[in-house]
Amino acid sequence: MEGGAAASTPAALPYYVAFSQLLGLTLVAMTGAWLGLYRGGIAWESDLQFNAHPLCMVIGLIFLQGDALLVYRVFRNEAKRTTKVLHGLLHIFALVIALVGLVAVFDYHRKEGYADLYSLHSWCGILVFVLYFVQWLVGFSFFLFPGASFSLRSRYRPQHIFFGATIFLLSVGTALLGLKEALLFKLRDKYSAFEPEGVLANVLGLLLACFGGAVLYILTRADWKRPSQAEEQALSMDFKTLTEGDSPGSQ
């Protein structure tokens, strides 16, 4: 890069990222296998519409959200604006897919005459979706929309990082609640008899937890954070000077 050599990538980081992706892709594939083998598959205009809900939520609020959080670790030496745009786009895709999953479950309940929003899973799910949408909206306003000042972005950034990790953790927990609810609703007493579907779903739950743990571990390693590039620091100082009247040497 111009203005200085690119920072080297920590030796172990690519292996942890690759492992997280292996877990995530296996998670998505196993979710599809569970729905195909034991739940009849997915179809929008039938009683299989409900099955779109778990698949969409796993793809959107687990896999894509996790990958969006890892963007700043994976693309450590790319242009900051490019990384921001990719981070935001992955979150948009996750949000849209999750919205499809929400529509599927509410529409299915309406057609079948089931009550809505009575379980802990549903309450947590709505909370996660609302928080995720607000997080994306505020993040866009602060970091992609050009109106926010540098000092305002700097003050908000720690909150953005904290709530991003928290919402992801809540998403994993909510998915685990939903998985258990789906198993108990269908299998009931047979669940304790080690039914094949129950065993497969238990493995799916372990994959959910492991993927969440892998993503959070990568995020919390301070030595794996994206290093500040020289030109980014210069642009930040220039922007602050223009918007607040400070001099670059006032820090």
From Swiss-Prot:
Q: Which UniProt keywords apply?
A: Acetylation, Cytoplasmic vesicle, Electron transport, Heme, Iron, Membrane, Metal-binding, Phosphoprotein, Translocase, Transmembrane, Transmembrane helix, Transport
Q: Which cell locations does it reside in?
A: Cytoplasmic vesicle, Secretory vesicle, Chromaffin granule membrane
Transmembrane segments annotated in the record for this chain: 17-37, 52-72, 86-106, 125-145, 159-179, 199-219
In terms of InterPro entries, this protein maps to: CYB561/CYBRD1-like (IPR043205), Cyt_b561/ferric_Rdtase_TM (IPR006593)
Q: Which residues lie on this side of the membrane: Vesicular?
A: 38-51, 107-124, 180-198
Which GO annotations describe the biological process of this protein? ascorbate homeostasis
EC number of this enzyme: 7.2.1.-
Q: Known Gene3D superfamilies for this protein?
A: 1.20.120.1770
Listed binding positions for heme b 1 are H53, D116, L117, Y118, S119, H121, E181
Summarize where heme b 2 binds, as residue positions. Answer: R73, K80, H87, H160, K225
How is the co-factor bound, per the entry? Binds 2 heme b groups non-covalently.
Reaction catalysed by this chain?
monodehydro-L-ascorbate radical(out) + L-ascorbate(in) = monodehydro-L-ascorbate radical(in) + L-ascorbate(out)
Cytoplasmic face residues? 1-16, 73-85, 146-158, 220-251
- So where does L-ascorbate get bound? K80, K84, R153
- What domain of life does the UniProt record list for this protein's source? Eukaryota
Q: Name one GO cellular component term.
A: lysosomal membrane
Domain named Cytochrome b561 is located at 19-220
Q: Name one GO molecular function term.
A: transmembrane monodehydroascorbate reductase activity
Cofactor(s) named in the record: heme b
List cystine links: none
Protein function: Transmembrane reductase that uses ascorbate as an electron donor in the cytoplasm and transfers electrons across membranes to reduce monodehydro-L-ascorbate radical in the lumen of secretory vesicles. It is therefore involved the regeneration and homeostasis within secretory vesicles of ascorbate which in turn provides reducing equivalents needed to support the activity of intravesicular enzymes.
Q: Which PANTHER family match?
A: CYTOCHROME B561-RELATED (PTHR10106), TRANSMEMBRANE ASCORBATE-DEPENDENT REDUCTASE CYB561 (PTHR10106:SF14)
> In its UniProt entry, what is this protein called?
Transmembrane ascorbate-dependent reductase CYB561
Gene source species: Pongo abelii (Sumatran orangutan)
Q: What is the lineage of its organism?
A: Eukaryota, Metazoa, Chordata, Craniata, Vertebrata
What is the primary gene name for this protein?
Answer: CYB561
